[in-house]
Swiss-Prot record:
Region (Involved in Mg(2+) ion dislocation from EF-Tu): 79-82
Organism encoding this protein: Shewanella denitrificans (strain OS217 / ATCC BAA-1090 / DSM 15013)
Protein name: Elongation factor Ts
Functional summary from the UniProt entry: Associates with the EF-Tu.GDP complex and induces the exchange of GDP to GTP. It remains bound to the aminoacyl-tRNA.EF-Tu.GTP complex up to the GTP hydrolysis stage on the ribosome.
Keyword line: Cytoplasm, Elongation factor, Protein biosynthesis
Length: 283
């Protein structure tokens, strides 16, 4: 299987490893990026694989409360200039109003606003996309927007200030689950197998490797879960400890960031200039 430059770039972005290391790893796995990451972590070629998705597209994240729920909406455009345009923001807010009023699906939102979207594209000169909408239920909800690009809503049993601070933490720390025990068994088993192999490759005896893995797994599930993370406002305590002190709890959260998973086309300026020079010579 031929390895493409795009695959090499994605692996470099996600691991921070060198180009040839990435190309070799992909060649060994026939282009399987996830397997390549695992193999590179085992060999030490990549120390971590934490970069989740290419954050490249522009746009805005908006939040609005409905009755017993909140709606989070992402609308994309091509540049940060248009992301601040009043016409673009008016369109995005109109879509949000409908979402918050009737909890409709993304497909219904797209269909309802398609004519308006096309007119806006013609007016602004950039592609506009109503990308996704998420809903979170709860009697007690707190929201936080970090600029225009990140939006968080947290549901739980706590005072408004506490939930707001938790929402700010979620924006900054990107947890994937509420509690360590919420991490899916498949993900835990995969990481555990990987950590055992890493420990064995370090030359540790089996019994020591097993103890090391227990500690590493506790760290792993803690780092990707909200209550297991160090609280950004009191780093010596976990979020779980803070909630316990306040006799509070979090049942769910949603975090959206503009452009998650969207790969924006990168312009090769040097190639563009070379092409223009070549075209001029032909003329």
């Amino acid at each position: 299987m031929a390895i493409t430059a795009a695959q090499v770039k994605e692996l470099r972005d996600r691991t921070g490893a060198g180009m040839m290391d990435c190309k070799n790893a992909l060649t060994e796995t026939n282009g399987d990026i996830e397997l390549a990451i695992d193999n590179m972590r085992k060999s030490g070629a990549a120390k971590a694989a934490k970069k989740a998705g290419n954050i490249a597209a522009d746009g805005t994240i908006l939040i609005k409360n409905g009755e017993g729920f909140a709606a989070l909406l992402e609308v994309n455009c091509q540049t940060d200039f248009v992301a601040k345009d009043s016409n673009f923001l008016a369109f995005a807010n109109a879509v949000l109003d409908v979402a918050a009023a009737s909890k409709v699906t993304i497909e219904e939102l797209k269909a309802q606003f398609e004519e308006t979207r096309v007119a806006l594209v013609t007016k602004i000169g950039e592609n506009i996309n109503v990308r996704r909408v998420e809903y979170i239920d709860g009697a007690n909800l707190a929201s936080y927007r970090h600029g225009e690009r990140i939006g968080v809503v947290v549901a739980g049993e706590a005072d408004e200030e506490t939930l707001k601070h938790i929402a700010m933490h979620v924006a900054a720390s990107k947890p994937e689950f509420v509690n360590p025990e919420d991490v899916p068994a498949e993900l835990v088993e995969r990481e555990q197998a990987l950590q055992i192999e890493i420990a064995m490759n370090e030359g540790k005896p089996a019994e020591i490797a097993e103890k090391m893995v227990v500690g590493r797994m506790k760290k792993f599930t803690g780092e990707i879960s909200l209550t297991g993370q160090a609280f950004i406002m009191e780093p010596k305590k976990t979020v779980g400890e803070i909630l316990k002190e306040k006799k509070a709890s979090v049942s769910n959260f949603i975090r959206l960031e503009v452009g998650e998973g969207i790969e924006k086309k990168e312009e090769d300026f040097a190639a563009e200039v070379a092409a223009q020079i070549a075209a001029t010579k032909k003329a």
